[in-house]
Amino acid sequence: MNPYAELTHFAGFDWAKDHHDVIIVDVQGKIITGFRMDHTVEGWRTWREKTAAYPRLGVAIETSFGAAVEQLLESAVSVYPVNPASAKRYRERKCASGNKTDRHDAWALADALRLDGQAWRALQPQDPIVAELRILCRDEVALIEERTALVNQLQQALHEYYPAAEEAFDDWTQRSAWAFVERFPTAEALTRAGKRQWEKFLHTHKLNRPETFTRRMEIFARAGEWKVSAPMVAAKSFYAVAKCRQLRLLENELHAYRRRIEALFASHPDSSTFGSLPGAGPKLAPRLLGEIGSDRTLYEDAGGLQCMAGTAPVSYQSGQIHRVSLRHRCNKMLRQTIHHLARLSRAQCTWAANYYDALRERGKTDAQALRSLGQRWLKIIWKMWQTRTCYDPELHLKNQLAHGSWVLSFQPSTPPKKHAKNFSKKATCNG
């Protein structure tokens, strides 16, 4: 039985950072009560007291996560998340003039749940491991973005006063690059140290590969040719060293995040399913589990998962007008993860590489080809997820042959193009 059918009262919850507006209506749409509550312990005590008389209460709210949603789920009510774009339409339906108040917004949500909620899906209590994994992975990505910002700031400073240092290292996310700036913060310090100290530094940090060692030594030798004013050097070198120290601290925290994520992921029964995906590796597999979750009833078919990931296009048809466009309203984290998976899978799956290459030859852009490949992977992932099985390249090929998959038409007679510069070298599967 649909839990919605058991509801006797419907609440609209217009949430904000420090307070929330609530309207409760009955099955006829009559407003039973309305109140504003603070987002505090006392405020949530007020919520429980005022809603205790409505044991079968459904709540509509414009978000599916956050502190307010956690508190609502703890109070044992049915929570129905509403897309903000849909909520805006419901508000406009209730007030064509455009008049807007928080109380009106809460009422519009409550009445929308009363009238249309039979087609909505209530939030289910989350698997604790999945919930923590999702938050950790999203925060890890945020920290990586912070690291990228710090690296850009460091490189810009070096470009202004110390271009030799910027030129000497290609990857500024490496500790050896930061150590160089800390050891030789200025071109003058580098020149004064001399050749023997340069060689010692490179050997200590295992930067003595023949193809790069000679080039770096040449760069160090001409570092003093770039002339900059003394005040600029003094200020920017102080700034650059500060950025290196920030990067070092942040890198330590990223390593701690990685250990926690990998431990949580390994403890979940679905880890083998997502971990078996070609190209997923220790970073993408936990993100996939965190975003897709473990509730098998959430997506009735692969199409629902594809829409959530943003790989399924949006079609608009009216009269003789028909256009197809990119889906913007989706789970951005899941879309980014699938994009990376599609890119990395080409190095390990022949069919994925052939499929991508064929789409590029047909004129598709890199992003379009990867999105199409991600669409194919999501169909596979959904089936693996539903059946709790690992990716089997031989079974996949057998299914392609049995069903006459059109992907097989992309298989060339010659080996696929290699993309070694983008991927680590791993065994190729023939899926």
Locations of the language-model features?
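A detector of single, family-specific signature residues
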Residues: M1-G431
